[in-house]
Amino acid sequence: MRHCIIVVGGHINDIFAKEFIEKEKPELCIAADSGMNFFYRNKLTPDWIIGDFDSASNEALDYFGGQPDISWIRLNPVKDDTDTESAIRKAIALGAEKITLLGATGTRIDHLLGNIELLGIGLQNHIPIQIVDERNRIRMIGAGITLKKEKQFGKFVSLIPYTNVVKGLTLTGFKYLLDHYDFKGFCSLGVSNEIIAESAEIAFEEGILIVIEARD
């Protein structure tokens, strides 16, 4: 599976992110605007740099600007989409089959919510996209999945309905179970569940769920 890691300009734990990249060995790395600062600090080289560069450091711009093997897309700062969205769409155009966003969380809640919204591009294109930081893994799913306890990202699994209702939600292997439940929005029912079996199943008939695996 051709994996693309996109580093964007939100909060990022350099140690975690560098280890994640080294472990995953992605076929493609993209820096979205000030995400290039992470690559510069850690002496890593992205394949692509995309953005309007309103927040990237001059040092990073100068350093990577002299490297001929990096491809650049300079965006107009007056635009309708974010640098992160442009990077995601470019990754898909380049043949990515899986996308991970690093640096997509942080103090700007508007950017975080916007980045979660962008996970839906993965559903539209049948490509899994996830947001990962040192404490969370966030995905958006339109069909059931299996979570293996030995491979889970964090102790807690939270489910948030993205559509008005997620019909027929069934949870097995969890501490708190559901059986063909119509899971509607504007409630906190799905927060902080836990896997208690070797594997847990999330199944539903219709709708879209946000799945967050979290650890303290």
Tell what function each PLM region has.
Residues 1-63:
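N-terminal beta-strand-loop-alpha-helix module at the start
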Residues 7, 30-33, 51, 73-74, ...:
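General beta-strand structural signal in soluble alpha/beta enzymes
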Residues 36-38, 56-58, 81, 108-109, ...:
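Short gly/pro/ser/thr-enriched loop/turn and capping motifs at secondary-structure boundaries
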Residues 71-93:
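Short phosphate-binding loop-to-helix
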Residues 106, 110-120:
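Short Gly/Thr/Asp-enriched flexible loops that form oxyanion-binding sites at enzyme active sites
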Residues 121-137:
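Short, acidic/small-residue loops that bind anionic groups at enzyme active sites
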Residues 136, 141-216:
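Long, charged alpha-helical interface segments
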